[in-house]
């Protein structure tokens, strides 16, 4: 069975495959994960106001066009003292989508005067599985999902354009995962992406501490952890693992 991961980032596809394979066990051999990018599908416009809504929008956009089950995630950083910002705006907090250094610099400036014990935060991920109804037929719903939310992509002129739906939606599942921790004052580590170099998770791998100059013995940031260490505690890992029963149900 093919399942489409709603991403154009092949690195994320590899990460999601690794996480799911750990829990699917032998069932993993019966699933082929492919990216939306490899199928040349456009990115939908993320018009949701929560991580759950955006994850569902991305998965719906793939499922209603391809007739294949689709997995999508939406995640971001929630900083308590900032009223849960950056939230769904995490990737474009400084204005440019995916500009990690600018986003990190702005975040540090905004909480510069906040004492260490008040810099609590958490990464949150919503992971969605959308299963299309391939028995209903083609050209249904005109891009409108079961709850009335229209899925859009971006037209050539930059305006929103409804995604043409070839299939209705049979079922939807969405799960949440959190990774609590705190924001430090300077970046550490070379792994990961986004805010990982600034984030120290509460859960730490046994027997491992930072070896960075001036920070020896301190807890690791997400960017100092190996991919396996991070996946074991990460928000994305928790949300995707919670989807496994719904994915397994497609196979049996």
UniProtKB/Swiss-Prot annotation:
Gene Ontology terms describing biological process: nucleotide metabolic process; purine nucleoside triphosphate catabolic process
Necessary cofactors: Mg(2+)
Keyword tags: Hydrolase, Magnesium, Metal-binding, Nucleotide metabolism, Nucleotide-binding
One Pfam entry name: Ham1p_like
Residues that hold Mg(2+) according to the record: 74
One Gene Ontology term, aspect cellular component: cytosol
Gene Ontology MF: a single term: XTP diphosphatase activity
Binding site for substrate: 7-12, 75, 193-196, 230, 235-236
EC id: 3.6.1.66
Positions annotated as active site in the UniProt record: 74 (proton acceptor)
Chain residue ranges for the region called Disordered: 202-229
CDD domains membership: HAM1
Reactions catalysed according to its record: XTP + H2O = XMP + diphosphate + H(+); dITP + H2O = dIMP + diphosphate + H(+); ITP + H2O = IMP + diphosphate + H(+)
Broadest EC class assigned to this enzyme: hydrolase
Role played: Pyrophosphatase that catalyzes the hydrolysis of nucleoside triphosphates to their monophosphate derivatives, with a high preference for the non-canonical purine nucleotides XTP (xanthosine triphosphate), dITP (deoxyinosine triphosphate) and ITP. Seems to function as a house-cleaning enzyme that removes non-canonical purine nucleotides from the nucleotide pool, thus preventing their incorporation into DNA/RNA and avoiding chromosomal lesions.
Matches recorded under HAMAP family: Non_canon_purine_NTPase
Quaternary structure annotation from Swiss-Prot or TrEMBL: Homodimer.
Family as reported in the entry's similarity comment: Belongs to the HAM1 NTPase family.
Descriptive protein name: dITP/XTP pyrophosphatase
Annotated organism of origin: Bifidobacterium longum (strain NCC 2705)
């Amino acid at each position: 069975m093919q399942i489409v991961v709603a991403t154009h980032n092949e690195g994320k596809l590899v990460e999601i495959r690794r996480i799911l394979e750990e829990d699917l066990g032998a069932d993993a051999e019966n699933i082929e994960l492919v990216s939306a990018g490899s199928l040349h599908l456009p990115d939908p416009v993320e018009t949701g106001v929560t991580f759950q809504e955006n994850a569902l929008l991305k998965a719906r956009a793939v499922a209603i066009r391809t007739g294949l089950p689709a997995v999508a995630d939406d995640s971001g950083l929630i900083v308590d003292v900032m009223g849960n910002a950056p939230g769904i705006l995490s990737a474009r907090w400084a204005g440019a989508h995916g500009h990690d250094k600018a986003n990190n610099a702005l975040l540090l400036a905004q909480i510069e005067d906040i004492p260490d014990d008040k810099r609590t935060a958490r990464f949150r991920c919503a992971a969605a599985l959308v299963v299309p109804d391939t028995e209903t037929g083609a050209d249904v719903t005109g891009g409108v999902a079961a709850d009335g939310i229209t899925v859009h992509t971006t037209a050539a002129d930059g305006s929103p354009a409804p995604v043409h739906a070839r299939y209705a939606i049979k079922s939807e599942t969405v799960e949440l995962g959190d990774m609590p921790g705190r924001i430090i004052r300077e970046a550490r580590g070379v792994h990961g992406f986004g805010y990982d170099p600034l984030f120290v998770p509460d859960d730490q791998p046994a027997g491992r501490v930072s070896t960075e100059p001036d920070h020896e013995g301190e807890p690791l940031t997400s960017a100092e952890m190996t991919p396996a260490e991070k996946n074991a505690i990460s928000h994305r890992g928790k949300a995707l693992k919670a989807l496994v029963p719904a994915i397994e149900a497609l196979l049996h």
